[in-house]
Amino acid sequence: MKTPLTEAVAAADSQGRFLSSTEIQTAFGRFRQASASLAAAKALTEKASSLASGAANAVYSKFPYTTSQNGPNFASTQTGKDKCVRDIGYYLRMVTYCLVVGGTGPLDDYLIGGIAEINRTFDLSPSWYVEALKYIKANHGLSGDPAVEANSYIDYAINALS
């Protein structure tokens, strides 16, 4: 999985050199941010269930047809609702992974790369997940640096889906 730090080390190693002062400064910057990122990951993990459920309800409110249209990819049944919450939780989990590693690698590697194909195959609308992520961003309860860190990855996911 790529992160800014692993990419810097890989580049230096492939060129047979030590890390440059700029690369080392980047590493120090990341370590200074790490505390805020880990606090955000911890808080989001602790609230994951309520955030995913609330986000699903936000989707149902904005897109009411999702709860009235029949089919395995809609939330007209409890099974469909459970799948929706599960899928939103997956996005949230990827955000927490990004916070832990300090880069967009988890979103890039595990989600964004194949999202268009997944959405097309299962007739899922990216706008549902955009709405869910907006809800999470507005309701995660974080402030200060942890909020800045979390919001940057949430925004990254929103932009990738838009």
Swiss-Prot record:
Where found?
A: Cellular thylakoid membrane
One biological-process term from Gene Ontology? photosynthesis
Q: Name one GO cellular component term.
A: plasma membrane-derived thylakoid membrane
Residues that hold (2R,3E)-phycocyanobilin according to the record: C84
The membrane topology noted for this protein in its Swiss-Prot or TrEMBL record is: Peripheral membrane protein
What's the PTM story here?
Contains one covalently linked bilin chromophore.
Q: Which family does it belong to?
A: Belongs to the phycobiliprotein family.
Q: Function, please? A: Light-harvesting photosynthetic bile pigment-protein from the phycobiliprotein complex (phycobilisome, PBS). Phycocyanin is the major phycobiliprotein in the PBS rod.
Q: What is this protein called?
A: C-phycocyanin-1 alpha subunit
Q: Which organism is it from?
A: Microchaete diplosiphon (Fremyella diplosiphon)
